[in-house]
Amino acid sequence: MSGARRDGVLVAKARAARLRAWAPYSGFRVGAAVRAGRRTFTGANVENASYGLTICAERAAVVAAVLAGARDLGAVAVASDTVPPTPPCGACLQTLAEFAGPGLPVTLSGGRGSRVETTLGELLPRAFRSLPPERRRG
């Protein structure tokens, strides 16, 4: 499968995950899909009345990947309905940086067909890292 087609599939999975979001307070629904090897893992934001306990879609997808034994992320897609598309928050970017390098492709998909292609390094140029890559394999 070509890179463009693979990224299209990743975006479609993120958009499908967005439909499963629980966002009764803000109405802001986000879905995410991460690729690790040949597998894809999805997540959606899950709000809580205590906003600080809300789980972001990107972190939910990363947690699903880690629970399945994945440690090296190859790409991520984030879907919202905003124009322009909404990037991951700082906590999500730092979580992605725990399992990927700055070259991680990040596709942001928004409303009215809007789309942004970027990298983790462009979104978080100075990620905090304390573990060397060989220790991150778990």
Where do the PLM segments sit?
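C-terminal binding/interaction regions
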Residues: 2-20, 70-138
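Stable alpha-helical structural segments in soluble proteins, enriched in small hydrophobic residues
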Residues: 14-17, 57, 61
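Short Gly/Pro-enriched turn/cap motifs at secondary-structure boundaries
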Residues: 22-25
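Short beta-strand scaffold segments in enzyme catalytic cores
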Residues: 27-37
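Short acidic-glycine loop/turn motifs at beta-strand connectors
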Residues: 36-39, 110-112
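Glycine/charged-rich beta-loop-alpha catalytic/anionic-binding loops adjacent to active sites
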Residues: 37-48, 72-76
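Compact, glycine-rich, soluble single-domain proteins
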Residues: 45-60
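Alpha-helix C-terminal capping segments
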Residues: 64-69
